[in-house]
């Protein structure tokens, strides 16, 4: 992403992979052009937001014609660095971590988990989903230039592990623990607490209708 594109709103940046995935499906089906209304219906983002998102990148479409699928796909592939592979490490090979290793982002050609770490001696030295599992105590011996880590460890251990990751040059952390981690300002961290998300969903189901949210 170039300097100008790095200034786009974070909400827009989060939607780009969603657009890219849908465009890949369109391309595979042989569709040559798509309207913002069709995109809106597919990705569940209103068409005005899609047009505004796309406007940050200049003229990507033509009024009355829509968007050329091949052009958009090529543009977003370059914007999202899809031709460069990002190696990710995973800390914690429990149930959730194991699921990640078996899945290993098979739909994302540019992202893969290259190694995992755990403290369980029965898992150390094995492979899960084709990914080698190393001793967490040897973390510093294995991390080279991997920029991203996924945390699926007990909350009590999350901060100390995070401190080690930061000292090793990790730039981004996907945190699946309930802990709210303290990191330096230059570190990007995304918290995903599945229990909180589920509780929030149940609350909205009980107290809000879908129509009320739309209004």
Curated annotation (Swiss-Prot):
Keywords: Cytoplasm, DNA-binding, NAD, Repressor, Transcription, Transcription regulation. Its main location: cytoplasm. GO terms for molecular function: DNA binding; DNA-binding transcription factor activity. Gene3D superfamilies: NAD(P)-binding Rossmann-like Domain (3.40.50.720), Winged helix-like DNA-binding domain superfamily/Winged helix DNA-binding domain (1.10.10.10). GO terms for biological process: negative regulation of DNA-templated transcription; response to redox state. Residues 18-57 bind DNA. It is found in: Cytoplasm. The keyword Ribonucleoprotein does not apply. Pfam families: CoA_binding, Put_DNA-bind_N. The keyword Amino-acid biosynthesis does not apply. NAD(+) binds at residues 92-97. SMART domains: CoA_binding (SM00881). InterPro entries: CoA-bd, NAD(P)-bd_dom_sf, Rex_DNA-bd_C_dom, Tscrpt_rep_Rex, WH-like_DNA-bd_sf, WH_DNA-bd_sf. GO terms for cellular component: cytoplasm. Homodimer. Modulates transcription in response to changes in cellular NADH/NAD(+) redox state. Belongs to the transcriptional regulatory Rex family. This is Redox-sensing transcriptional repressor Rex. It comes from Bacillus velezensis (strain DSM 23117 / BGSC 10A6 / LMG 26770 / FZB42) (Bacillus amyloliquefaciens subsp. plantarum).
């Amino acid at each position: 992403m170039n300097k100008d594109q790095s200034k786009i709103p974070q909400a827009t940046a989060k939607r780009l992979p969603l657009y890219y995935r849908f465009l890949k499906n369109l391309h595979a089906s042989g569709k040559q052009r798509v309207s913002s209304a069709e995109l809106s219906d597919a990705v569940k983002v209103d068409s005005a937001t899609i047009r505004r998102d796309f406007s940050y990148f200049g003229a990507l479409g033509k009024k009355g014609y829509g968007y050329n699928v091949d052009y958009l796909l090529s543009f977003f592939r370059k914007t999202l660095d899809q031709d460069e592979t990002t190696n990710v490490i995973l800390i914690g090979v429990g149930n959730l971590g194991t699921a990640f290793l078996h899945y290993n982002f098979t739909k994302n050609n540019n992202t893969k988990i290259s190694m995992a770490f755990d403290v369980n001696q029965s898992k150390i030295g094995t492979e899960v989903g084709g990914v080698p599992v190393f001793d967490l105590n040897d973390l510093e011996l294995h991390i080279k230039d991997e920029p991203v880590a996924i945390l699926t460890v007990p909350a009590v251990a999350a901060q100390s592990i995070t401190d080690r990751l930061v000292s090793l040059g990790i730039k981004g952390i996907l945190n699946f623990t309930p802990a709210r981690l303290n990191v330096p300002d230059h570190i990007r961290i995304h918290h995903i607490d599945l229990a909180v998300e589920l509780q929030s969903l149940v609350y909205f189901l009980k107290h809000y209708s879908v129509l009320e949210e739309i209004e």
